[in-house]
Curated annotation (Swiss-Prot):
Can form homotrimers. Heterotrimer; forms functional heterotrimers producing channel with different properties. Residues 514-523, 534-545 have a biased composition (Basic and acidic residues). Glycans are attached at N201, N350. It holds the Pfam family ASC. This is Degenerin-like protein asic-2. Could form pH-gated heterotrimeric sodium channels that act as postsynaptic excitatory sensors in the nervous system, generating rapid, transient inward currents that fully desensitize upon extracellular acidification.
Length: 545
C-alpha cells in the first residue's frame, strides 16, 4: 500500500507541477513518447548539475574584485625625513676617543684605496680587489663599529638640526625644530622627520610647490674654513630623503631618495591607498605575529616584513644580527671582525651564480598589509645657487646668509661657492589633491550564487519560486505519508468507492438522464407516425372527389 501511495503522490504531483518535462513524462500516451521525454529530462538535469558544479567551484575559489575610486579632498601632509649622507663629522671622529676604532677603520680604508697593503681585522685587504667590494665591506664595517658606541657617546659627531637644516618653511610659513622628530639611523646617523609627531596637524588643501615643505640643507662636506669633514667612506655629497605616511618606517636604506649638493630637488608626491580583503578572499594581514615582528613600533608593511625575514636569515646563518636592520631584545649584533663581515658579505649573494641572495617572495612568507598608504615621488632638479644668487637664510645658528656681515666667509662669492659645494634645497609637495583608492572586496558572494543558480535553474529546468514551493509541498506530503505509516490514503479503495453516496448519486443521475433520453426518443418516433397517417387520409379524400 505504501508503494502505491508514493506512486499516487507522484502522479498527482506530475499533473500540477510546473517543473519542465515532468508533466510530459507522466502524461505520455505511449512508451516511445515517455522514453523521449525522460531522455530530455535527464539531459537538462545533467546540464543543470554541470552548471551547479561550476557555480559552487567558483564560489569556493573565493575570487576578489578591486574597485577603483578617484577621490579629491584635503590631505594630511606626509612625513618627510632628511639625513646627511655623511653620518658622522670626521673632525670629531679623529679627535674623540669614543670613535677611535672608527678612526682606525677610516685610516685603514684610505690606505687600502691607495694601495698601501697591510693586515687588518676587517679584511679590507683580503680578497677585495674590486673597488666596489672594498667600499661595500668598509661601509658594513662602519655600521658594525658605530653600533658598539652608545647613542650618548655618538652625539658630538652627529649633525644637529642647526648643522643640517638652515631654513624651513611650510606653505610659505616658517617652521622650526619642534616640527621635527629626531632619531639615529644605523647608516645615516642623525635624521630628522617633519610632521611625524601625532600632535602636529600639517595638511594641505591646495596642490603645488608653493603649498609644500621647503628646506635648505647644508651637509658640510667641507667646513667654512676649508677643512674636510666628510668620512673617507662617504661616496656621495648630499642628503637621503624619505617620504612616507605617519607611523610607517622611513625605509631610508632601501627606499630613500638621494638629493645632491648644488641642486634644488623638487619632489612631487602622489598618494595611493590600498584596502585589501582578508581571508578567504585575500591574503592581507594587519601585523606579523609578535614572536617574529621586529618592527613593532611601526605600521606593518611588506618592507618591514622583508627586513625581519632578512634579519632572521642573518641570525640563522651568521649567528649574529645585522645592525642595519632592527634587532630583537635577545639578539646579539655582529662584531666588526673579518669572520662576521665575511658572513654578511656572503648573504648579499652573487646574483649571476648558483648562490643568489635570499628570495624574499618565496622564502619569507610575507603578505601585503590590509590597509596601506603609499606616496609615489617624482623628482626634478635645478642648479642651486645660480651664479648671481647670494644665499639668504633666516637661521642664525648655522652657516648663515651670504651677506657682508657674515664673518665665516671672506667674501660673498666665497659663501656662494661654499653653498654650491655643501648646500641644497629640498621641496616636497603634493602633485595633486586627488588620489586613487583601491578597495579589494569579495568578487562572488552568496547573493551572486543565488542569482546565478536561479538563472540556470530557470534555463534548464524551468524552475521558479513557485516550482520550489511545489517541490517543498511534495516533500511535506511525502514526509507526512511516511510519518503516519501509510494511514493517510492517497486514493479510495473499492469498498469506499462502492459505498460512496456521492458516486451513487452520480450514477442515479446518469440512469435518470439515460431514461429521459430514451423517452424523448420514443416520443419523437410516435410523432412521426401520426404525421404520416394524416397525410395518407388527405390523399384518399382527394381521390374520392
Amino acid at each position: 500500500m505504501r508503494g502505491g501511495g508514493f506512486v499516487q503522490i507522484f502522479k498527482d504531483f506530475s499533473n500540477w507541477s510546473t517543473v519542465a518535462v515532468v508533466p510530459h513524462v507522466a502524461n505520455a500516451n505511449n512508451k516511445i513518447s515517455r522514453i523521449f521525454w525522460i531522455a530530455i529530462f535527464l539531459f537538462v538535469l545533467g546540464m543543470f548539475a554541470y552548471e551547479l558544479y561550476i557555480l559552487i567551484a567558483k564560489f569556493f575559489s573565493y575570487p576578489a574584485t578591486v574597485n577603483t575610486e578617484i577621490l579629491f579632498e584635503k590631505q594630511i601632509f606626509p612625513v618627510v625625513t632628511v639625513c646627511n649622507m655623511n653620518p658622522y663629522k670626521y673632525s670629531v671622529v679623529k679627535s674623540n676617543s669614543a670613535f677611535s676604532s672608527v678612526n682606525t677603520l677610516m685610516t685603514t680604508y684610505s690606505d687600502a684605496t691607495v694601495g698601501t697593503f697591510s693586515t687588518d681585522k676587517w679584511g679590507l685587504y683580503a680578497d677585495n680587489d674590486e673597488t666596489y667590494d672594498l667600499d661595500s665591506r668598509a661601509a658594513d664595517a662602519l655600521v658594525l663599529e658605530a653600533n658598539l658606541i652608545s647613542d650618548t657617546a655618538k652625539v658630538p659627531a652627529l649633525y644637529t638640526y642647526a648643522d643640517l637644516i638652515q631654513d624651513c618653511s611650510f606653505a610659505g610659513i616658517p617652521c622650526s625644530e619642534s616640527d621635527f622628530t629626531k632619531f639615529i639611523d644605523p647608516v645615516y646617523g642623525a635624521c630628522y622627520s617633519f610632521n611625524e609627531d601625532a600632535s602636529l596637524n600639517y595638511s594641505v588643501s591646495r596642490e603645488g610647490i608653493q603649498f609644500g615643505l621647503k628646506l635648505m640643507l647644508t651637509v658640510t662636506q667641507t667646513k667654512t674654513n676649508g677643512n674636510t669633514d666628510s668620512l673617507p667612506t662617504t661616496k656621495l655629497a648630499g642628503a637621503r630623503i624619505g617620504v612616507n605616511s605617519r607611523g610607517s618606517s622611513p625605509g631610508l636604506d632601501s627606499n630613500g631618495i638621494d638629493a645632491g649638493v648644488g641642486y634644488e630637488s623638487a619632489v612631487s608626491v602622489s598618494l595611493t591607498q590600498n584596502v585589501r580583503a582578508k581571508k578567504p578572499y585575500g591574503t592581507c594581514v594587519d601585523r606579523e605575529p609578535d614572536s617574529s615582528d621586529y618592527y613593532k613600533d611601526f605600521i606593518y608593511t611588506l618592507e618591514t616584513c622583508f627586513n625581519g625575514c632578512k634579519q632572521r636569515d642573518t641570525i640563522a646563518k651568521c649567528q649574529c644580527a645585522n645592525p642595519r636592520l632592527a634587532l630583537g631584545s635577545t639578539d646579539t649584533a655582529c662584531q666588526p671582525i673579518k669572520a662576521d663581515l665575511d658572513c654578511l658579505q656572503t648573504l648579499k649573494g652573487n646574483q649571476t651564480s648558483s648562490t643568489p641572495n635570499i628570495d624574499l617572495l618565496v622564502e619569507c612568507n610575507c603578505n601585503p598589509p590590509c590597509d596601506e598608504s603609499t606616496y609615489t615621488p617624482t623628482v626634478s632638479l635645478a642648479q642651486f645657487p645660480s651664479t648671481s644668487y647670494y644665499v639668504a637664510t633666516s637661521s642664525t645658528a648655522g652657516v648663515g646668509s651670504c651677506s657682508s656681515t657674515n664673518s665665516k666667509f671672506s667674501s660673498k662669492s666665497d659663501c656662494q661657492k661654499w653653498y654650491n659645494n655643501n648646500g641644497m634645497i629640498i621641496q616636497v609637495f603634493l602633485e595633486t589633491l586627488s588620489y586613487e583608492l583601491y578597495t579589494e572586496t569579495a568578487g562572488y558572494t552568496v547573493s551572486n550564487v543565488i542569482n546565478d543558480l536561479g538563472g540556470q535553474a530557470g534555463l534548464w529546468l524551468g524552475l521558479s519560486v513557485i516550482s520550489v514551493v511545489e517541490m517543498t509541498g511534495l516533500m511535506l506530503v511525502m514526509g507526512a505519508f511516511c510519518v503516519t505509516g501509510g494511514a493517510i490514503k492517497m486514493a479510495p479503495d473499492d469498498d469506499e468507492i462502492e459505498n460512496d453516496h456521492r458516486i451513487k448519486d452520480v450514477e442515479d443521475v446518469k440512469k435518470e438522464i439515460d431514461h429521459l433520453e430514451k423517452k424523448h426518443g420514443e416520443m419523437e418516433s410516435g410523432s412521426d407516425g401520426e404525421v404520416d397517417d394524416i397525410e395518407n387520409k388527405g390523399d384518399e379524400e382527394k381521390k374520392k372527389k
